[in-house]
């Protein structure tokens, strides 16, 4: 077979050389060279089969085809001898070869046109796939934007609820402060009522009623505060649950989007590879089928069978390579795709469940808002009741304060009248003693009675020289008993010695250069100022200074302190905790007043000018007819309340 093939090749080459020389000599164009046809066929085969092994097999196939084209098979060369070819047969063969070459070139052009069409179609498919992918991406972005808007809406709602909560807490604190102020004022009222218990026993029922109302207000406030705390706790729990659901939903959506994008990318990649391989195999098969269909005769049957077998081998080899290279990957991708589909289904179910939960939470949030609105409405009603109760209490406090001021003024008037009456009584008793003594002396002188009858009295009584007695009240010094007796009786008493009881009181001297004066000083307890004019006086930065044996003490008024017309301000010592402190007529000093027996109290204005002074001395006793009324240093110089130990 090899020798026959070699002889056929030699005969073919000699025939080709003779035909070429004849065509050149006759002026006929020579057909294209065999290498050119082979290179074109090899280019087509390379486009159809990209691998090196396929290229090698295609070269072998084309070589066999070129042998078939130029000289036919070995059987044809054996059937025809070199001497049997005539010139006409060679021309006919060359014409057939030219026709075949033209057909092959036309087919090649058709294949290139089809290739361009397939490329355009591939570009269109890619654009459609990209548009679909962009559409899906846009949908997921829209869904994500809606989710973000929902999260923003929930966040804004949360911020509004927090602001409402802060506002409610602020209002609650304000009401607490108002409640504390009201309670403080009620305590002050209670202290004032206790201080004036002796003079205002009929006000006990009013005070008991106020205490009961205060207890009711406290109970209602505690109940409302507890309900508000419960509702706030429920609202916080609902907010936390909504936040957790939103976070889990966002995570699930992100995971779903990532898995779908990855699966689509890998599927597209594998589909493109499969399409390229299918296109290559289809192109080669198509070329071989068309080439085979156009050949006829026994000359090409063997070459067609060889080419078909070569193509089958190439296809099997390509299929094996594809199975070997992409089989495992396709299986893995299918498994991964199934798992991702399951994951996506699970995420969709979780997303649906989270949406249902969010709807439930929104419903619950609406219910909680309704409850909060009801609680706020109830709280508003309670606040209105509390404000009304506060107004009523304020009106009652004002009425009781007015009544207390009236009672205090009446008490001051009665006390002043009592002091005046007591002073006049002392003077009258002193004068009566003097008149009795003069009468007894006159009876002895006239002999109506003997001196022995008055001896015991004369020797038993204390003989003292008649002196003046000072009894100075906070409202000014009064004339002495001696001057009054001198006014009533001008009879000189020089020879007779009058036995009388001397009344000694604390010598309290009050001086003032303006309408505001120091009314009373109780050592260690209180300093009272009085405005005797009808106008309101400013006491801003005025100063009260005390000087005694134990040291000094001072108090300065606030810049907005005033004293009304015909009114009194009491400045209590800091040790007097039970005393009222309303900031208007009763003030607690920042320091303790001195408790010395001898005190000098000075009232000065903001520039340091002395406006009033008050001196206290505690040498105070009252002894009339062996009935002594001794004032302890505690009651000495206390003025209005000194006689009652208040």
UniProtKB/Swiss-Prot annotation:
Q: Which residues form the IF rod domain?
A: 90-446
Q: Region entry Coil 2: which residue ranges?
A: 300-439
Q: Where is the composition biased (Polar residues)?
A: 48-67, 75-87, 281-301, 488-505
- Can you tell which superkingdom this protein's organism belongs to? Eukaryota
Report any Pfam family annotated for this entry: Filament
Q: Which Gene3D superfamilies match?
A: 1.20.58.70, Lamin Tail domain
Region annotation (Head) ranges = 1-85
Q: Which GO CC terms are listed, alphabetically?
A: intermediate filament; nucleus
Protein name (record): Lamin-1
Region of interest (Linker 1), ranges: 127-137
Fill in the domain comment: Contains an alpha-helical IF rod domain organization with three coiled coil-forming segments (coil 1A, coil 1B, and coil 2).
Q: Which SMART domains match?
A: Filament
Keywords noted in UniProt: Coiled coil, Intermediate filament, Nucleus
Q: Do you know which InterPro entries this protein is assigned to?
A: IF_rod_dom, Lamin_tail_dom, Lamin_tail_dom_sf
What positions does the domain LTD occupy?
Answer: 504-618
Compartments, record wording: Nucleus
Task: Motif Nuclear localization signal — list its residue ranges.
Answer: 457-471
Per the record, which residues fall in region Disordered?
Answer: 1-94, 281-304, 476-513
